[in-house]
A protein has these predicted regions:
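A short glycine-rich beta-turn/N-cap micro-motif
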Residues: 31, 53-57
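His/acidic/aromatic-lined binding-pocket segments of jelly-roll/cupin-type domains
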Residues: 48-50
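Residue-level recognition of alpha-helix boundary/capping or hinge positions
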Residues: 17, 108, 137-138
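N-terminal helix-cap/turn-to-beta initiation motif at the start of protein domains
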Residues: 17-32
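Sec-dependent bacterial lipoprotein signal peptides
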Residues: 1-17
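Contiguous, well-ordered beta-strand patches that form the walls/edges
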Residues: 36-43, 56-119
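Short, exposed beta-strand-loop hairpins at the edges of beta-sheets
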Residues: 114-130
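Short, low-complexity, Pro/Ser/Thr/Gly-rich segments in the mature regions of secreted, periplasmic
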Residues: 130-139
Length: 139
């Protein structure tokens, strides 16, 4: 009986693990970078992303030393072929760039109020917060 209970618990635990399902509509709106959960990271500025339904994203960069500037880029959310097979839930900024100079991020968390990205091909480390790892809250 213990074996059966253990097997059932293992099956239920495995079934409860589901991958993040990212829908393009979930990303729409304005997101502000927020690193309050990472006290060891002290940015000198920040970024605000406004994702629009037409596939464009308006980005506002603010920097204490260099000043503010705005850019508009295109984006797509979906699956791409990665070095270890298909990567799902990927955000590509400027995916049309023929030289692949656009940015690619794995969306690792997306809720109504919070979003996290990890640059493709990198792993989370304290030193990469702000460049390879980004954390946002909805504005």
């Amino acid at each position: 009986m213990k074996k059966i209970s253990l097997i059932i618990m293992a099956i239920l635990a495995f079934a409860g693990c589901s991958k993040l399902e990212v829908n393009k509509e979930n990303i729409l709106g304005t997101w502000v970078d927020d690193y309050s959960a990472y006290p060891y990271y002290a940015p000198e500025g920040g970024e605000t992303y406004t994702f629009n339904a037409d596939g464009t994203v308006d980005i506002h960069y603010y920097d204490v030393f260099a000043g503010d500037h705005d850019v508009q880029r295109t984006y797509t959310v979906g699956a791409v072929e990665g070095t270890s097979g298909m990567e799902n839930d990927v955000l590509l900024l400027d995916p049309h760039m023929s030289d692949y100079s656009g940015d690619g991020f794995k969306i690792v968390k997306l809720t109504k109020t919070e979003m996290e990205w990890q640059r493709l091909g990198t792993t989370f480390q304290k030193g990469t917060v702000g460049s390879d790892f980004k954390h946002f809250r909805r504005k």
